């Protein structure tokens, strides 16, 4: 079973969200990285870009496929993990720590509340 930290929120598109004050840190779940296989490239937005909930904000490329990343919340990108440019394997090795992808200042904080808990996400992936 995938590693699912309880303090995080989860989206149907397999992104995780960590609330940090008035900002949220976003990455992909352990389940997602294991489904994708070895990650070889990560494409992310620029600081200052706006992201829309349920719309693509970047992509991850694995040896098997290219998969779009979907924003779990709308808002402005205030930080991007540039470490992933040179170390895309962090997504496989440490999806919740080293491989966070972007930090967003949400335009609507209630979107975070609509995301799934770890238990709800676990139930969803067990049905896939």
UniProtKB/Swiss-Prot annotation:
Modification sites for N6-lipoyllysine: 64
CC per GO annotation: cytosol; glycine cleavage complex
Domain Lipoyl-binding: 23-105
GO BP term, pick one: glycine decarboxylation via glycine cleavage system
ATP-binding as UniProt keyword: no
Keywords, alphabetical: Lipoyl
Cofactor binding: number and manner: Binds 1 lipoyl cofactor covalently.
Cofactor: (R)-lipoate
Subunit field text: The glycine cleavage system is composed of four proteins: P, T, L and H.
Role, per record: The glycine cleavage system catalyzes the degradation of glycine. The H protein shuttles the methylamine group of glycine from the P protein to the T protein. Is also involved in protein lipoylation via its role as an octanoyl/lipoyl carrier protein intermediate.
PANTHER family reported for this sequence: GLYCINE CLEAVAGE SYSTEM H PROTEIN (PTHR11715), GLYCINE CLEAVAGE SYSTEM H PROTEIN-RELATED (PTHR11715:SF3)
Family assignment from sequence similarity: Belongs to the GcvH family.
Name this protein carries in UniProt: Glycine cleavage system H protein
Name of the gene encoding the protein in the UniProt record: gcvH
């Amino acid at each position: 079973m995938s590693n699912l930290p309880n303090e995080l929120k989860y989206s149907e598109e397999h992104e995780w969200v960590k609330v940090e004050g008035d900002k949220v840190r976003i990455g992909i779940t352990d389940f997602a990285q294991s489904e994708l296989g070895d990650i070889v490239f990560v494409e992310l937005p620029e600081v200052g870009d706006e992201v829309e909930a349920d719309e693509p904000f970047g992509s991850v490329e694995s040896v098997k496929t290219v998969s779009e990343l979907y924003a779990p919340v709308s808002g402005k990108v205030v930080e991007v993990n540039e470490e992933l440019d040179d170390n895309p394997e962090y997504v496989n090795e440490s999806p919740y720590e080293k491989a966070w992808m972007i930090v967003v200042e949400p335009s609507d904080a209630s979107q975070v509340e609509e995301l799934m808990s770890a238990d709800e996400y676990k139930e969803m992936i067990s049905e896939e």
